[in-house]
């Protein structure tokens, strides 16, 4: 029996946030050998009942099951399109229609943005790393056919409708060259709305945008205040529409995240929680007027791909005492992510966990490799009810956690770690009869997971965690055997292009938070960039993506960047010898 088992659009199943007609592809399954596709038919429809056909390819004589295009089809903003396909093999057997998939479009033009970035902070808060709330309410006037939210932030954010978090992604919108390239997210909130008043809000954290970054420790690399951008499109059954936007009517407040930094961890004081802050009917007397923040919306790009998520839980393996008397949790696996903590105490009781990677030779806590990073999770109880907490706007590289403070007896079942990284489908595995080689492969895979948190980093634990271009260039091919990295690298390569110098030079790290930060420093001074092998990422990575996936689009998107880098080398390679300023190794 011939059938389509995976219908994909842009290498994804049911993507949300598409801004161009996607590429289509599928996986065939058959009980026969040597099956070759002879033809396909692709349909796009406007409704789940598949009555309103918008596009029908007819039978196309082709063995292509990837990079299939719906030639001539045009999409509209904030719409859901339903897709199905069928194929016929060389023996004339037809698969029948696949299960119906879908894709949802984002906003297709800058002009459609009516929202403004809003902030509960002012520039006087530039030195602070606390969390804030922004909120509003709106009315739903009838039966909702579909509702989509388009959101992003300067900083990190969590988005809420009627008191419930929207989406499963974390550390959103991730790390980009914010002032030149910022992703926004699309959410289907149709089932979260109710007729009448609805509450909407976001909690914001400093993140990569204004937090302390790099081994130099500079903060406010992109701006001095966090801000949220949100726009909701509602389509009613009667054909009318509504648009809800962030603007100066929104209100702001401090959040219970009293401190949050990428390197140092988070302090969350549950006593400061504001009940119902993102729900309908909330009285915001203690909230203040937000500030609107100017930002160029031309740099916004819809993200339908590789969002950071909690990917897998890792249970604690043991709790033990070190020779120095510290109580330590061992999760049995070095990972990047955070810890879910269950705790029952009284108001003011504190949980404090210091995360770290290894024990020293004597079996004690070892922190030297963290350098200046603290990697500390702190939770302060608000009452005597059992609760569960995990950090909002930070992540750690760890296998162990020292229990510096915990009310009562710490039980192993109270602690569960979660690996957190960009969501990518695993596409390659390797096992053999040699357990040492198997362990090496295991370490490579977990090393990939730990260093693919929105950008390809050098490490996940110390006060660095930067997108070193040389590391990404060297590991790109291996990573692409193990995971579907197409969207992960395509997104990051846009920041490579964005951060190139006007002449075409490539920074040592992308996003570039190092260049020009310290006068006279051999590594950081302005003009220190474009090292051999590191800067070659501008050409090698797009080419590797093309060789791996056969998709010319990434070459089209990156061509100007690739050409600029080659031109830069030609300009500065005297007598064809490349020795431009700083070279590593």
Region annotations inferred by a language model:
Residues 202, 465, 469-472, 531-539:
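Short alpha-helical patches at coil-to-helix transitions and adjacent helical residues
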Residues 406, 474-485, 538-554:
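Well-ordered alpha-helical scaffold segments within catalytic/enzyme domains
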Residues 2-80, 84-462, 470-471, 487-490, ...:
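Extracellular/oxidizing-compartment recognition motifs
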Residues 438-441, 445, 486-497, 539, ...:
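Hydrophobic core segments within long, regular secondary-structure runs in both alpha-
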Residues 167, 201-202, 467, 540, ...:
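Structural recognition of the beta-strand scaffold that forms the well-ordered cores
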Residues 449, 501, 547-550, 567-574:
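Sec-exported extracytoplasmic/periplasmic mature domains
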Residues 511-517, 526-544, 548-550:
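Charged, long alpha-helical assembly modules
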